[in-house]
Swiss-Prot record:
Belongs to the RNA polymerase beta' chain family. RpoC2 subfamily. One of its GO terms (cellular component) is DNA-directed RNA polymerase complex. It holds the Pfam family RNA_pol_Rpb1_3. CDD domains: RNAP_beta'_C (cd02655). The gene is rpoC2. Keywords: Chloroplast, DNA-directed RNA polymerase, Metal-binding, Nucleotidyltransferase, Plastid, Transcription, Transferase, Zinc. In plastids the minimal PEP RNA polymerase catalytic core is composed of four subunits: alpha, beta, beta', and beta''. When a (nuclear-encoded) sigma factor is associated with the core the holoenzyme is formed, which can initiate transcription. This is DNA-directed RNA polymerase subunit beta''.
């Protein structure tokens, strides 16, 4: 064994692995296998000789366990107390408990290890777990530590841990909880196997046609691996990554600059030793991502074949290798974590502890931000790295300086004294997975809400709110209820607290319909009065006319009525406006449709002719309106209208023909009247035929006569006498003008018959309900009624009139009275309790009682019963509070809600103070009565809401704006036109006038402009705002002219009215802010809350940004805001929502997150998880668009997340980078006043570079998931797959190419097409890069056979057939399906020698072959 260093150390699993790897590299696989066999026998031999066994005695429990549990319990009790005092929220308490337990569990594990290491190093459990033979730490922890926190079926962590371990045995509760986790483990294993199999299938389908096809693709691109000075640890990682790759640029000695290694060398372990020696830190490497080949990779870009550590062979199916390598660990990942059965593990935090006692001081340069952690502590977070100093107690000791990194949580305040070994800081864990939920906080008791005013910190938009609920009993009653007592009053059991009378409207006798015990469902009918109809008959019609089914004959007048049969009784149905019956009459019937005219002004004749109507008393004016119908004339012009759809040639009459009555217009359609035919056409079809009756005269001079009315006896044109009132109308016929004389029919509006003569009220005289008749117009004036049916112009109806409002519960019953030959009309009213209760009390606990009996006759306004609320037990009342909003709310504070405490316990407390007793938590509340030695407390419970939006602050200080974007008017951009820009800035009451400045735009390319504007900065409350102002506006000036606030007119600038074309203005409304001067703002209850900012822009018509105010200093550390829904001194019921708290939950980091996460990255899912109802902050998932400094002067790089530790959407990343590379930006010169446009790089390079960024992002994301699980996958495999995901682009503009918009095509393909098109001098196509997930990429395979055998077979085949695609059978899958030899490995096609000349082949062969060939 040459060059093997003798190892005199413990050889565990890791060292064994290294040993075998060494032998594999230096010798070959056969030798390595032999060595492994030898090692196996060695192990068995010594294991059997040592006689290692495991018994229950080997499981030793550390003796500190009980102490630790006690300590943890104490911490939890403290957390409960703090919660009850209102210092932390419910959510934070939960978090505190979980943190306490997970910390206890971790430290117990440390204890176990410590114990084994120091006292019992040969313990068989210890040997087993730590040699890597079987089992791991978490399992040993469960055997001898504590089982720890479990997650419930939905994956949430339960806040009660299992404190026992398996050595001690579990209690019943523990066993059940443990069962949750175990079941989860079993189910997950099954699911994960399936998932991981499917992942492998998709991966192989994507990569199946990627082979090694060439020796070298001659690419100029390379991957750069470099190491900065700080990260020397990661140097070994990088050496691992570059092992077996090929260098693309030569490596120079950093000191002498001579070439150490030429380009194109394979990196071997020996070379890596050389790099370490010369301290090389930059490597330019070839990688599958840089390979130029299309759907293939060359030998040099791929590097070693990992199975034999040599350069890969040509024809190797590396795509399939890659798919298998990525998918296979998936199954392992699943199995790996679940031996423990769903245990919650949290990574140990990196903490900073103090070495000595002393006072802590922060450096001035250390910038910190206040943050409330999810455990409810206010801590400082460092925004930059710096240091703190400890000043020790002893003067002999030196000062201790502790370096602090960025994003460290610091627990102590400045100048705080600290004992040795205290945790003063811990690093924020940025890569943990967190989901934010919203938890509603419900009230435990009913009572009143009190919000004490907390001290405000200046300039904070979010502040903390404390909410007290002081207990009391809440009763809701109607507003007009009567309250039964005064304060300090004793109430007996079942006495009422308030009571409201229920009073009836109509007199009548009582009848119960159903006798339900629940009063709200009980129906009571009160029979009211009767009417009798004399000489009348009721007959049923065979079929209903106008939905009416009975005929009521009332002394010769026939009425149509609608009647419903129910329980053999006839009930009269009334319509919405209480119309009961309609009179049948033919006097106002017309033959056909037409136009009706009457003077509708005349209908309302209430006010005096000369009275002036006062504008302000408009309301009364409406109330005085009572429609009084004056009796007058209706004028009717008949006109027959047919709606038809037919061709012209079917028509039997032409436009302008005069026809007789009964003429056939189209086959089967006859006219009812004679007259002139008018035809309207639509799309060459006949739409309507109308026939206007009358006489027709042809001729020329009608101007004088048209549109006039003539009376009988007059003569037109000195020879045409008129016999009936007529209206002359001028129509255009076929070819000549015609005058149509249309007869006018006149109907007189009738007077009413009094109906009360025919009806006798038999029951009681002062009846509330009357029947009366009424005449109404059926149609509005000047309305053309199309049609040929008979119309009733006027209808006479019977209506039911009631003095009271409640008419929806009326029943009208008709019955024949046999003796008197009359028809009786009985009116009864249903009485339902629900109609008396206002809706907001509907579901509150109101009780009720009735005071009436069946068949009792009651008068009007009798008390029917009470709505009331009773007490369930006797009370002694201490205080009452009343509040009247939409209902009367009564809060009783009785003895049960109060506590009496001795005064000497709480010294210095006065009336209305709040008390929290730290020893006895029950003594918490507000003092409401005090005397010599006792205090009476009203019990209460505080609720704490941190980081609420402060409602008061926002209106006063924060600048709010709203941009209103108009419809965009874009004028034609012609060259060298002087555009005018004017910026008008006017408040509600003032106006700014400004200089106009002209600008000529010199721009050669007809390119769509996206202009950038210079910014106007506004500073307010320490926040900066920018407002976009058009360029060249450094010259503008604002003139403001102020008016007195009482001057109400808004003056509009005159200039604006004239220049309307091409103007695009945006209006900006700001809530009154200090920036705009607004005199109205200070007036009380002024309506002018909004100031107006108006920008008018001229040349920048395509500007995509709306001009407005933008906040520059976005607070990146802003937390999600919590909301509180109740207001001070409200009364609240039990179980109402007080507010919402946001809580962050850490998700257990096992492969439950792993596989789906890998799938999500490889499928390039667009994550839109915004649920609408959760008020999340808008900054979720935003990426930085420009590299810039933020408020804390931190550099934020392009394409990084604004909020830290968040998943990036790869599609957005691609877009951000492509915009950055490919966007056309204007460059504006102020002196010459001209604009030029340029972009960073061309379309192809922009796409290529942004793809490279996304590729490295996806690679890192997937590797991060696998590495967190301890699975090592070589980057090559992932790179092969990622290369397949990032080849396509989406065409956005086709140019002169034969492509279509939104077509998806390969990047190299479109580049080739564009080169050809440009060489011919034509317009090339534009495109944007497109990222496809693995499923999409597999379906977009150029071979349709491969795609169809993967998914969506019919769709793929149909599409291929329509497009007429050809499958060239390049990949493996197509060939297998067709039945050919697969083109990989030995079957890979070797076309090298096919095209060479014969003579060349012959010259290379040896002579002896030659002779064979010639024979």
């Amino acid at each position: 064994m040459k060059n093997y260093k003798y190892q005199n150390t413990l050889i565990g699993k890791k060292q064994l692995r290294q040993l075998l790897a060494w032998s594999f590299t230096n010798y070959d696989s056969m030798q390595a296998c032999a060595l492994a066999d030898e090692l196996k026998y060695l192990g068995f031999k010594y294991a059997s000789q040592a006689g290692i066994s495991i018994s229950i005695e080997d499981l030793k429990i550390p003796f500190v366990k009980n102490l630790m549990l006690e300590k943890a319990n104490q911490e939890i009790i403290n957390a409960e107390k703090i919660y009850l005092k209102g210092k932390i929220t419910d959510v934070e308490r939960f978090q505190k408990i979980i943190d306490t337990w997970s910390l206890t569990s971790e430290s117990l594990k440390e204890q176990v290890i410590y114990y084994f290491k120091n006292y019992d190093p040969l313990n068989s459990v210890y040997i087993m777990a730590f040699s890597g033979a079987r089992g791991n730490l978490s399992q040993v922890r469960q055997l001898v530590g504590m089982r720890g926190l479990m997650s419930d079926p939905s994956g949430e962590i339960m806040n009660l841990p299992i404190k026992k371990n398996f050595r001690e045995g579990l209690t019943i509760t523990d066993y059940l909880m443990s069962g949750y986790g175990a079941r989860k483990g079993i189910v997950d294993t099954a699911l994960k196997t399936a998932n991981s199999g499917y992942l492998t299938r998709r991966l192989i389908d994507v990569g199946q046609d990627v082979l090694i096809r060439e020796k070298d693709c001659l690419t100029n691109h390379s991957f750069l691996f470099s190491v900065s000075n700080e990260e020397l640890k990661s140097l070994n990682l990088i050496y691992q990554k570059i092992l077996g790759r090929v260098l693309s640029k030569p490596i120079h000695d950093p000191k002498t600059n001579r070439i150490l290694v030429p380009a194109g060398t394979q990196i071997t372990p020996k070379l890596i030793e050389k790099f370490k020696e010369y301290n090389v830190k930059k490597f330019y490497i070839r990688s599958p991502l840089t390979c130029n080949l299309y759907r293939a990779i060359c030998q040099n870009c791929y590097g070693w074949d990992l199975a034999n550590e040599n350069l890969v062979d040509i024809g190797e199916a590396i795509g399939i290798l890659a798919g298998q390598s990525i998918g296979e660990p998936g199954t392992q990942l699943t199995m790996r974590t679940f031996h423990t059965g769903g245990i919650f593990t949290s990574e140990a935090r990196q903490q900073i502890t103090t070495p000595i006692n002393g006072v802590i001081r922060f450096y001035k340069t250390l910038k910190t931000v206040l943050l409330r952690t999810n455990r409810g502590e206010d801590v400082l977070i460092t925004k930059n790295s710096g240091s703190v100093i400890l000043i020790p107690d002893d003067e002999d000791q030196d000062l201790v300086q502790i370096e602090i990194l960025r994003n460290t949580i610091l627990f102590p305040k400045n100048n705080q004294y600290i004992v040795k070994d205290t945790v003063i800081g811990e690093l924020l864990n940025t890569n943990r997975q967190i989901k934010t939920e919203v938890k509603p906080i419900l009230s435990d008791t009913c009572g009143e809400i009190f919000m004490p005013v907390l001290k405000k910190k200046i300039n904070l938009l979010n502040n903390n709110k404390l909410l007290w609920i002081l207990s009391g009993q809440l009763y809701n009653g109607p507003i007009n209820s009567f309250v039964n007592f005064y304060s300090d009053y004793k109430l007996n059991c079942r006495s009422y607290i308030f009571r409201t009378k229920i009073i009836n409207h109509y007199s009548g006798s009582v009848e119960f319909i159903n006798t339900k015990s629940n009063l709200y469902q009980r129906l009571i009918r009160i029979k009211n009065n009767k009417y009798a109809f004399f000489n009348s008959k009721l007959e049923k019609l065979r079929y209903s006319i106008q939905h009416k089914n009975y005929l009521l004959n009332l002394q010769g007048d026939k009425y149509l009525v609608k009647i419903q049969k129910k329980d053999l009784r006839l009930y009269l149905q009334a319509t919405r406006n209480y119309q009961v019956a309609t009179l049948i009459t033919n006097r106002f019937k017309t033959l056909v449709g037409g136009t009706v005219y009457y003077d509708h002004q005349n209908v309302y004749k209430n006010y005096k002719p000369n009275s002036t109507i006062n504008y302000l008393s408009r309301v009364n004016f409406l109330n005085n309106y009572k429609p009084v119908v004056s009796h007058k004339t209706i004028i009717w012009l008949g006109e027959e209208v047919y709606k038809v759809n037919c061709e012209l040639n079917i028509l039997l009459a032409e436009h302008g023909d005069f026809i007789s009555e009964g003429f056939e217009l189209i086959p089967g359609l006859f006219s009812k009247t004679s007259g002139v035919v008018v035809i309207k056409q639509k799309n060459n079809l006949i739409h309507t035929i109308s026939i206007k009756s009358g006489l027709v005269y042809e001729g020329k001079k009608f101007k004088m006569t048209s549109k006039k009315v003539y009376y009988p006896g007059e003569i037109i044109f000195s020879h045409i006498p008129i016999t009936k009132i007529s209206f002359c109308e001028h129509i255009t016929g076929k070819n000549i003008e015609q005058l149509l004389v249309r007869p006018i029919e006149i109907y007189e509006f009738p007077y009413l018959n009094n109906i009360s003569a025919k009806i006798q009220n038999t029951h009681n005289k002062d009846s509330n309900i009357r029947l009366s008749s009424k005449i109404i117009y059926s149609y509005k004036p000047n309305q053309l009624i199309k049609g040929t049916r008979n119309l009733n112009l006027i209808s006479t109806i019977l209506t039911l009139k009631s003095k009271e409002t409640v008419t929806k519960n009326l029943n009208l019953e008709l019955s024949h009275n046999q003796k008197t030959k009359l028809i009786d009309l009985k009116i009864s009213e249903k009485f339902n309790l629900n109609h008396y209760i206002s809706p907001n009390l509907r579901y509150k606990n109101l009780q009720s009682c009735l005071l009436i009996q069946p068949n009792q006759f009651i008068d009007r306004y009798t008390n029917l019963g009470y709505l009331e609320s009773k007490t369930s037990n006797s009370l002694e009342i201490v205080k009452i509070k009343l509040k009247i909003k939409d209902s009367k709310q009564i809060l009783l504070i009785s003895n049960q809600d109060c506590l009496t405490v001795k005064k000497e316990k709480f010294i210095g407390k006065k009336l209305n103070d709040f008390i929290i007793n730290s020893s006895n938590v029950n003594e918490t509340g507000k003092i409401i009565i005090e005397n010599e030695n006792n205090l009476t407390l009203q019990k209460g419970k505080p609720y704490f809401f941190p980081n609420c939006k402060d409602d008061n602050v926002i209106n006063k200080t924060n600048l709010q704006y709203k941009t209103i974007s108009p419809t965009r008017v874009s004028p034609r951009l012609e060259k060298n036109i002087n555009y005018k820009i004017s910026l008008n800035y006017y408040d509600m009451m003032k106006l700014s006038v400004n200089k106009d400045c002209t600008l000529s735009e010199k721009n050669e390319d007809p390119i769509k402009i996206k202009s950038e504007f210079s910014k106007l900065f506004l500073k307010k409350n320490g926040k900066l705002y920018s407002s976009l102002i058009p360029q060249f506006f450094k010259k503008f000036s604002l003139h403001t002219s102020e008016f007195s606030p009482k001057y109400k007119q808004i003056i509009q600038p005159n200039g604006l009215a004239k220049r309307t074309i091409g103007k695009m203005d945006r209006t900006l409304l700001m809530q009154s802010s200090e920036i705009t001067k607004n005199d109205y703002k200070n007036l009380k209850n002024s309506n002018y809350q909004l100031a107006l900012l108006k920008f008018v822009e001229y040349p920048f018509t395509k500007s995509t940004k709306s001009i407005g105010l933008y906040s520059i200093t976005e607070d990146y550390f802003e937390q999600d805001v919590n909301s509180v829904f109740c207001k001070n001194s409200e009364f609240i019921e039990e179980g109402e929502t007080l507010g919402l708290l946001n809580l962050e939950k850490e998700i257990t980091g096992d492969i439950v997150q792993g596989l789906p996460r890998i799938e999500e990255i490889l499928e390039a899912r667009k994550k839109n998880s915004n649920i609408k109802r959760i008020p999340t902050s808008q900054k979720k998932g935003l990426l930085v668009q420009k590299s810039s400094l933020d408020t804390n002067f931190e550099f934020r790089k392009l394409g990084t997340n604004i909020k830290e530790n968040e998943k990036v959407n790869p599609h957005k990343l691609l877009k951000v980078y492509f915009n950055y590379y490919g966007w056309i930006k204007p460059f504006i010169c102020d002196q010459k006043e001209e604009i030029k446009y340029a972009r960073l790089i061309k379309n192809y390079e922009g796409s290529y570079k942004s793809f490279k960024k996304v590729q490295s992002f996806i690679l890192d994301s997937v590797q991060a998931v696998y590495q967190s699980q301890g699975v090592i996958i070589n980057d090559k495999h992932l790179e092969v797959i990622i290369k397949q995901m990032t080849t396509k682009v989406l065409i956005t503009y086709e140019g002169n190419t034969p492509l279509l918009r939104r077509e998806v095509i390969d990047l190299y393909h479109i580049q080739y097409i564009n080169q050809i098109i440009q060489s011919q001098g034509k317009q090339s196509a534009c495109y944007v890069p497109l990222l496809l997930g693995i499923t999409k990429a597999a379906l977009n395979n150029p071979s349709f056979i491969s795609a169809a055998s993967f998914q969506e077979t019919t769709r793929v085949l149909t599409k291929a057939a329509i497009e007429g695609r050809i499958d060239w059978l390049r990949g493996l899958k197509e060939n297998i399906i067709i039945g050919h030899l697969i083109p990989a490995g030995t079957g890979s096609q070797n076309y090298r020698n096919c095209f060479k000349k014969e003579s060349l082949v012959r010259s290379k062969l040896p002579k002896s072959f030659d002779t064979i060939l010639t024979r």
